């Protein structure tokens, strides 16, 4: 039956007829044309409305609950009267994160309802644990459920970031420049430099990446290299990429250790996508709480309260993002109306995991193309020429309970290779990692590592081993090494002790050994700073050479306001040196860190080495570049100087701006229009960034959602009124550069005394400016906010006559007293008041 809109007349009849729904008249009073449904007399007008059909709200109600205060709306139902029989035509469910959820069986029963009739009690049974009850008196439908019919409101483990907020062509260019000079002892020198550029140009979710470097700029040995030229679209959980890139930039889900150096021209496709965000901070085993009514859930561990969360009626997964990592038990306490309803113990399973996290769906990727293999050499003994080959492969990764795994199968140069990686946490203290490779030319590799936290939490231990045997085709070297190490936190045994670390590395292929032992202790920590003690020993040998032993001991003094000082001694190469180091950090300004170090031999034979060496460095953060300048004179007599600088440029249409930051290859250009050194702040996802001058560029990480809010800076005396563009919500993909152009007014609070041309005071006069008005007091004094772009005050009198005050506010900031000012155009205030002319006063 087609839906019909109620006519105005029918609506009036319906409203009149509703009066009868709340009264149970006796038979003698009932209208002869009315009928009775479920014990309620239905007037003719309302009966006609039911025959046309109407929508009523659907609420979920827990069986046994008193009243409807905890009922939740979960949708709507369309009911109609068919030949005296009330029916449900369809149910429309409305999903909400805060609402209770029904079980899948109950959901299917609801969605399958079509022209289902109500019985005489106005009820439709669905399952043994759920039924629909219609109240004609309140015109609402209740889904009455037992606890068994409730589903569980689980927290989403993944979310697509959605469409890009930037619909026009834009680009981000990151640059990294370096230059270094070596002065030799004999007076010679050499200088070299490089410039690395990474450009990402995008249109919405489509982007092209160009990555390359220039070497030896300004010298006779200039060179250039293009590392990547690739088109990419990563959207809605799938990623496609095509172009050229070197093997160092090859993206794969699984390990690919047998790929030799070279360049690949090919394509890849899969669901390993950054546009889908996986939340791995929740417990792999959901913590579930049932609430019979709205209330609180308390999580407690070892008597310590970890979290308090509020929920409505139903089964809910508790948010465990803020809980500590590990595997442990928590006590889940449900409190309703101040009373403890239930208490039970559940297990939290939160482990650090690679990739998309525990519980994420299977990830896959296929790729292939042409492979240019670079010339390869192993210690000059075994060489292979450059070669062209094909390349094809597939990668996949996933998890099973706490086990995370990844696998890759690929082929090139007529060789087939398979690789796997497994990560398995055992309890909360042990973590096992295994990585294996097997190739068709009999090459194989096995890498294993175990890390453990020993009982008591005061010590940890790790063991690594790698063994590789290469056949006659793969361009890779054999390996046979092992390492073991650990850390002992003695502070947990006695507060005056520190931390002791030891490690041993053994490379059996090259017959080299390496031992280290380090100790650190905090000697003092208080108002005046902190003092730490460092000591250690290193011993290594390489092949048949004699063992080389180095020792050091140092005191590190950290002072307030970013000051740091260290003094100590080292013994190496047969002589002992005294070392001094100092560092100063700054919160503001272009120079952020300066430091220096000085070393002098105090005993032993230095041989050809100098007895005095040292250096200095500075880290800078300027508007268009940030980096480090370093000068160092080594013991061997060489003087090394190097400068590195990096930054970013963002572009969209006619807007272009630069920054010394390199936070990502997306960003935002702020066209604030601030004059001189004016400053406001941008609050982006809770972080505060300063904005100076007319235009700023702020690089941001791609594949992210950002909430941007402009506000006054706490470090500036200026006050600004951000009229429009204060808040923005952005979704940025690689290469997306958004432009925010707020309307900003620089405000100055002006106070003074206003006079007419003859010097009389404008007492109790209403004066105006560009953004507001105020009234002077009996002495002609005023206080008002003025927009610096419109530094005028005017006063109207005698109808259309005005006088005006021109304020000099170019150097004014915050608040200013302007003293006596003259309202030009008003000869005398006394004349205005004596004539009684109508004015704004």
From Swiss-Prot:
Pfam families: CooC_C (PF15976), TcfC (PF16967). The keyword Transport applies. InterPro entries: CarboxyPept-like_regulatory, Pilus_assem_C, Pilus_assem_E-set-like_dom. Keywords: Fimbrium biogenesis, Signal, Transport. Induction: Negatively regulated by H-NS. Positively regulated by IHF and EcpR. The keyword Lipoprotein does not apply. Residues 1-29 form the signal peptide. Part of the ecpRABCDE operon, which encodes the E.coli common pilus (ECP). ECP is found in both commensal and pathogenic strains and plays a dual role in early-stage biofilm development and host cell recognition. Belongs to the EcpC/MatD family. This is Probable outer membrane usher protein EcpC. It comes from Escherichia coli O157:H7. The gene is ecpC.
């Amino acid at each position: 039956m087609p839906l019909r809109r109620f006519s105005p007349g029918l609506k009036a009849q319906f409203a009149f007829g509703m009066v009868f729904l709340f009264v149970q008249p006796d038979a003698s009073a009932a209208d002869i044309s009315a009928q009775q449904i479920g014990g309620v007399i239905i007037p003719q007008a309302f009966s006609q409305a039911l025959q046309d059909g109407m929508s009523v709200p659907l609420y979920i109600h827990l069986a046994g609950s008193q009243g409807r205060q905890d009922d939740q709306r979960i949708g709507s139902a369309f009911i109609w009267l068919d030949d005296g029989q009330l029916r449900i035509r369809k149910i429309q469910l409305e999903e909400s994160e805060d609402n209770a959820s029904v079980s899948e069986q109950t959901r299917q029963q609801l969605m399958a309802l079509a022209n289902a009739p109500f019985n005489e009690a106005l009820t439709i049974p669905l399952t043994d644990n759920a039924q629909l009850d219609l109240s004609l008196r309140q015109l609402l439908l209740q889904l009455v459920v037992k606890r068994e019919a409730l589903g569980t409101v689980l927290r989403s483990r993944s979310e697509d970031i959605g469409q890009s907020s930037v619909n026009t062509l834009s680009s981000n260019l990151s640059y990294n420049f370096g230059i270094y000079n070596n002065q030799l002892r004999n007076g010679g020198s050499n200088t070299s430099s490089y410039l690395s550029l990474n450009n990402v140009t995008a249109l919405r979710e489509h982007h092209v990446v160009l990555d390359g470097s220039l070497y030896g700029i300004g010298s006779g040995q200039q060179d250039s290299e293009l590392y990547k030229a690739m088109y990419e679209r990563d959207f809605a959980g799938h990623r496609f990429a095509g172009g050229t890139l070197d093997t160092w930039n090859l993206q794969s889900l699984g390990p690919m250790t047998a790929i030799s150096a070279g360049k690949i021209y090919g394509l890849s496709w899969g669901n390993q996508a950054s546009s889908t965000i996986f939340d791995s901070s929740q417990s792999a085993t959901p913590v579930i709480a049932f609430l019979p009514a709205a209330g609180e859930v308390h999580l407690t561990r070892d008597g310590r309260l970890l979290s308090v969360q509020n929920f409505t009626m139903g089964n809910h997964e508790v948010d465990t993002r803020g809980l500590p990592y590990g595997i442990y038990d928590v006590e889940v306490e449900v409190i309703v109306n101040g009373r403890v309803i239930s208490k039970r113990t559940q297990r939290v399973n939160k482990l650090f995991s690679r990739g998309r996290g525990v519980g994420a769906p299977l990830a896959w990727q296929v790729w292939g193309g042409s492979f240019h293999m670079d010339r390869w050499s192993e210690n000059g003994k075994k060489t292979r020429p450059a070669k062209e080959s094909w390349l094809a492969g597939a990668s996949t990764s996933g998890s099973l309970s706490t086990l995370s795994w990844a696998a890759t199968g690929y082929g090139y140069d007529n060789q087939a290779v398979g690789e796997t990686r497994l990560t398995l946490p055992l309890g909360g203290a042990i973590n096992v990692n295994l990585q294996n490779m097997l190739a068709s030319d009999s090459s194989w590799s096995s890498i294993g590592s175990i890390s453990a936290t020993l009982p008591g939490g005061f010590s940890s231990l790790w063991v690594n081993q790698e063994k590789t045997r290469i056949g006659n085709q793969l361009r890779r070297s054999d390996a046979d090494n092992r390492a073991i190490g650990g850390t002992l936190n003695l502070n947990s045994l006695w507060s005056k002790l520190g931390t002791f670390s030891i490690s041993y590395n053994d490379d059996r292929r090259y017959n080299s050994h390496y031992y280290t032992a380090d100790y650190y202790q905090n000697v003092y920590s208080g108002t005046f700073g902190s003092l730490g003690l460092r000591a250690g020993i290193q011993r290594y040998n390489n092949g048949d050479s004699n063992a080389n032993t180095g020792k050091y001991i140092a005191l590190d003094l950290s002072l307030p306001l970013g000051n740091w000082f260290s003094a100590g001694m080292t013994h190496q190469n047969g002589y002992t040196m005294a070392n001094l180091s100092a560092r100063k950090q700054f919160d503001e300004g272009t120079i952020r860190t300066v430091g220096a170090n000085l070393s002098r031999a105090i005993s032993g034979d230095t041989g050809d080495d100098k007895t005095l060496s040292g250096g200095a460095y500075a880290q800078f953060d300027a508007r268009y570049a940030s980096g480090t300048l370093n000068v160092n004179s080594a013991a061997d007599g060489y003087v090394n100087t190097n400068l590195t600088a990096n930054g970013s440029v963002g572009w969209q249409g006619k807007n272009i701006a630069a920054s010394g930051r390199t936070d990502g290859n997306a960003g935002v250009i702020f066209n604030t229009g601030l004059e001189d050194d004016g400053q406001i702040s941008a609050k982006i996802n809770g972080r505060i960034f300063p904005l100076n001058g007319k235009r700023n560029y702020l690089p941001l990480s791609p594949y992210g959602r950002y909430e941007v809010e402009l506000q006054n800076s706490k470090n500036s005396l200026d006050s600004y009124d951000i009229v429009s563009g204060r808040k923005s919500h952005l979704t940025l993909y690689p290469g997306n550069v958004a432009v925010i152009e707020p309307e900003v007014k620089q405000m100055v609070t002006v106070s003074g005394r206003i006079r007419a041309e003859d010097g009389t005071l404008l007492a109790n006069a209403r004066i105006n400016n560009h953004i507001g008005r105020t009234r002077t007091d009996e002495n002609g004094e005023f206080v008002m906010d003025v927009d610096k772009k419109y530094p005028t005050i005017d006063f109207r009198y005698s109808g259309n006559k005005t006088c005006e005050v021109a304020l000099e506010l170019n150097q004014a900031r915050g608040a200013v007293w302007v003293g006596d000012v003259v309202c030009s155009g008003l000869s005398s205030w006394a004349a205005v008041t004596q004539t009684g002319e109508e004015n704004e006063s």
